[in-house]
């Protein structure tokens, strides 16, 4: 877990208010469809029932467990399921009309036809991106007790297969005084279509200029693939010398198995992943122009290019993608009730799961978007 996210959450809310752009994974398990206990007092005054389903990013699986418990406690006549199948699968399921919302670590891509497909799925109405789940991405590795610093340039070369040994001269130069083993580096990447992969590739391109591929499918020419966030974390924990990119919460869960998190040099010296360093990076958060204040797409390229001292800009924004209109009456009520519950539970339990609770004007803007869903 990353501790003390309160300052970070406050910064996130402030940045959303001042941004010039205000006018922005495969685990095959469901988070569950059984009803949680409790919430009887709230349920006495609220009549929401029926089945609500979502699918997509595995990065927010733990967050969805928090939200599901709160939602079913408040609305005992509702049923909820979230399948953490990866961002790509979630978008396809949403656009195909088989689920009510999609979780995606990447915004819908117009050049891939996803925006138009979503509009068609929503009965001719726009789909909106609700960035409700925010968390940093860790560079997790397995190298015994060795603490490692890596520059963004070195990181790109590792994942391209240009650096293959832990005692490579480039890594030595960034870790003076550290006894680096002559050990093969095993790159672990997401084999499914993943928004985490999409964002990590955007990050490598923005931060280094030494990365050519893009999209949810990570290149498979180097290393070994694994499905979902938990899959790559498990793989790194089981292979001495392995390295991967994964949401911080999953990396922390594997610390007892020998997994460590690298300090990254974004241009002003090695930075440890912490609530403070994430908060510094969020000072530069901005949103893209989308034509609607309720469609909130983060300008990730600008964020990833940040090299301010003490900042950790490798941050994942997980969107929950919904129809702005076009649901039937029951589904609209369920969607609005669920996401109001999500926004009412940006709390300590969410922090403990490794995420950044949103607050302030950003939270207010999300609430306005949910209220505007028809």
Where are these regions (language model features)?
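Small-molecule pocket liners
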Residues: 134-139, 145-146, 184-185, 269-270, ...
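Extracytoplasmic ligand-binding site segments that recognize negatively charged/polar headgroups
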Residues: 136-140, 145-234
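N-terminal segment of the mature folded domain
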Residues: 27, 32-172, 233-235, 242-254
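Second-shell loop/turn segments in exported
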Residues: 50-56, 79-82, 126-127, 140-146, ...
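Extracellular/periplasmic catalytic domains that process cell-envelope and extracellular macromolecules
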Residues: 94-96, 121-124, 130-133, 149-150, ...
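Bacterial N-terminal signal peptides that target proteins for export
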Residues: 1-12
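Flexible, solvent-exposed loop/hinge segments that line or gate ligand/substrate-binding clefts
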Residues: 213-348, 353-374
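C-terminal motif of bacterial Sec signal peptides marking the signal peptidase cleavage site
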Residues: 20-24
